[in-house]
Each structure stands twice: as structure tokens, then as C-alpha cells.
Amino acid sequence: MLLSIVTGLNESKSRNEVIIKKFNDLCELLKPLHYDGIELSLLEPEKIEVRKILEVADSYAMKIPALGTGATYVRFGFSLGDMEETIRKKAIDRIEKYIEFARETESKVIIGLIRGRYKSDNSPKKEILNIIASLKECCWIAQNNNVELVFEPINQFEIDSYNTISQALELLKDVGSDNLKLLIDSYHIYLEEDPGFVWEDLEEIAHLVRHLHLADTTRRAPGTGHFDFKSFLEIFKKKGYNGFCSIETIMKPSFEEVARESSQYLRLIL
């Protein structure tokens, strides 16, 4: 398994030379800590000069395993499930920008918060249908660009739809696209899944998983809470998973400290 960590580049407010320097500094920090890649949480990927980012990544033998898209919903309010067709179209257009970036960086594109929250108690069924229809369109765009999308079940306190593994499996069936797979996050698993059955459930769906997010029960660095990462990761290792495990936590006391602490802990069990 490979290790990465989530961060942003503040590309919306920075010149390209500043963005490239920030990425270089991240690689310089993370490579000695035995990281294999950096997962980028972006808002406007089209503002980044991909060729230069790749030059830096290659010089450190680092990958960009996945792109986070949630900022599109948080900042702009665009979502795949919105009741307004114009808003859904804007969300799909934004996803296309991520896909174009991912095509060059060989990254996966994450479908998480961008599916949005329900606008009212009367709209859930319609918004679920909107999410499915929007995702079918996104999958078609991704397939034409040879990019894989990964869908993340997220806990009910952060989003209204598809909180559990079983619900995410239903979505995959409803969308019916070979290039839509799963992202499993240890923190959301801890909050949403039945602890008596979660390991069995993970074994059953491991073949559909293409990316992992790691955070402990406190949403801090792995090893600071009581989540059983050894058992969690062993399931995927046994199933032949050789992709990325990406640290996605509250970055306190600092990004550097979380990166160091997480690597020291996880390298003992990866």
C-alpha cells in the first residue's frame, strides 16, 4: 500500500509560480517522511499549470492519487443533487474541470460533498434521482477521459445522502458505470457502520474500493484514537489492494506534525 496526505494549494488566490513552489515545498517535506503522494483538494484545478506540477512530482517520485471536489459545493454551492437544473449543470461542468486535470495527473476524482445537502424535507427522493442522473453524466465524461471516479460514503452529520457502505453500493448499481468505484474513509466507517459487522461488510466490498481515507476516531492522526487500523488495512491487503491510503484529518497541532505522526504510526502496519 502507498501513503499520501490531503492538502490544498490555494490555487484560486495564488499565481502559478506560488502554487508550484508550494507543491514543491510539500514534496520536499513529505518525501523524507516516506510519503508516496499528495492528494489535492482543489477549487479551480484549471488555474494550475499541470505540466509544471507533474515535473515537480516526478522529480520527487511522488504521485497525485486523487482530487477532492468538495470545495465546489462548500464555496460555490454547486451540487449534483440540486433541485435547480442550472446548479446541477454547473456542478457537472466543475467536475469536468477536475476530470481534465486528473487525465493529465492520472488521478482519481472524488465524489463526496459535491453531491450536496437536501434543500427541504420534501425533496430527498427527487434529489437522489438528480444525484444518480448527474453522476451518469459525470461517468460518461470521465470514461471518455480515461479517468476513474470514486464515491465516498460520508457520515450523516455532514451530508444527507449515501451515508453507509450499503447505500453507496445501491448508488453504484443505480449508476451502472464501470468507472465509478468506492472510496472508504475510516472516520465515516466508525460513525456510521455497525461495529459487529463492519469487517465482514468491508471484505465483501473490498474489490470495489480504489482509494482509502484514514483518520482516527477523534478525526485526528491515525494512532491518536482507538480505531483498529491494523484490522481495517489487513482486509484490503488480503484482497490485493495496492492503492493509496490518504491521511485526511484535522491538521492539528500542525500539518507537518500530523504528517510525521501519521507516517510513523502507519508505516508499522502498512
For each feature predicted by the language model, list its residue ranges.
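Generic structural signal for helix capping and beta-alpha/helix-loop junctions
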Residues: K47, V74-R75, K119, E152, ...
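Gly/Pro-rich active-site loop or hairpin
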Residues: N10-I20, L80-T86, N122, S161-Y162, ...
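Conserved beta-strand positions in the central sheet of alpha/beta enzyme cores
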Residues: E39, A66-G68, I110-I111, V150, ...
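Active-site beta-loop-alpha junctions enriched in small/polar residues
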Residues: V6-N10, S41-L43, T69-T72, I114-G116, ...
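Generic structural signal for well-ordered alpha-helices
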Residues: F23-E28, V50-L54, I95-I99, I132-C139, ...
